[in-house]
Amino acid sequence: MTAEEDSNSTGRFPEADSRDVPEPAARQEAEPAAGPDPEARPQDDARAEADRTRSSVGRRALLGWGGAGLALGAVAAGGTATALHNDEADADPASAGQAVPFHGTHQAGISTAVPDRLHFAAFDVTTEDRDELIQLLKDWTTAAARMTAGHAVGDGAFGPVPESPPDDTGEASGLKPSRLTLTVGFGPSLFDKDRFGLAEQRPEALVELPAFPGDKLEKARSGGDLCVQACADDPQVAVHAIRNLARIAFGKAAIRWSQLGFGKTSSTTPDAQTPRNMFGFKDGTRNVSGSDEKALDEHVWVAEKDGPAWLAGGSYLVARRIRMHIETWDRTSLKEQEEIFGRDKREGAPVGKAKEHDEPFLKAMLPTSHVRLAHPDAHNGARILRRGYSFTDGTDGLGRLDAGLFFLAYQRDVRRGFIPIQRSLARHDALNEYIQHVGSALFAVPPGVRGKDDWWGRELFS
């Protein structure tokens, strides 16, 4: 699967375009205003010493820092949330206009505007204790709410107790929120073997993705119990977020694989210029719009009637690492490239049309063209919301670029979305000669966090 002209393209790789105007998060509720923050990038006045010491001790205990942390286990039990929370209600709003609201009906990072950079991480849960997993999700939620607002985790990177590790790693200190969004999902393996008493809560649509023709999946780049998608305009802000969530997870979960991305390959903002993928073609021309509530309800959000109840308002995320054979593509004639995609390379217009957004005449295209095969008309109207990014990870042993598309797509049901679309593309798409799927994962993405007492996955564990 590769790049598609439509909402359904399961394999494309556009370049970044920072001209997107930040749109209001679709159906996201505004974050309550906050007061002074202990470290809202940059650092503010310190708090009372007793408060700081209690928070620092709780943080050390959470991360398992040596004998002192273990000896103070009783304090840690009540101190962890304090260290991470840091009175969010008392924090100043950071960089107005660059922070995306964290709380809302749906998680940010799905229908909200797409920032320029990505750091995606899949985690294996290493603890066998259900309560520890719940506490991890609570701590992640608290930290995520702070970071997306432009604040540091806990007491920040510069104190208050020099003899203990700081709560925040510090590389984002002084930086703006950069439209950071953090989106969490649960993989099929989290429900396997009833590890945490969740087997009966596994959604029917959270299936193992089938093997598709041409797949060459690497186990080290596939699967995961949990995932976190961090998107931001500043790559350092996105990396900082994943780094700190991984740090909080120490002893409970560990990163299984991760991927950095640049040059968003699709936009959810209708008036934004369509980005180009690494094959040089405009990508995501007909992507689902983040402001089209009817389309989102029909194709992206899980409805109450779909079940299970804990997932209503959430979605399903497919992640695919698609390597592009750049050198082979670059030796292909322009005429053949355009026939493969079914679009003009300069304007992005469908074959036989003049403008990018003209309705394509599918019969004018080759039966194996990417646009024709991925079009909703070929799949009973099925659409997916694509949010992928390009990647480059150096070169292989033969000096060929390890580059391509990190494909991300949200949908209401993968059995009616990604799976039939990709099955058709994998069998017939002429673009398959130039791409290889090497990584794959599927996650159920819970609904948004609706208030300070809510947390990622609360209804799943209730």
Tell me what each language-model feature is:
Residues 1-57:
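N-terminal secretory signal peptides
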Residues 3-4, 56, 61-82, 86-462:
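Long, histidine/aromatic-enriched segments associated with O2/redox biology
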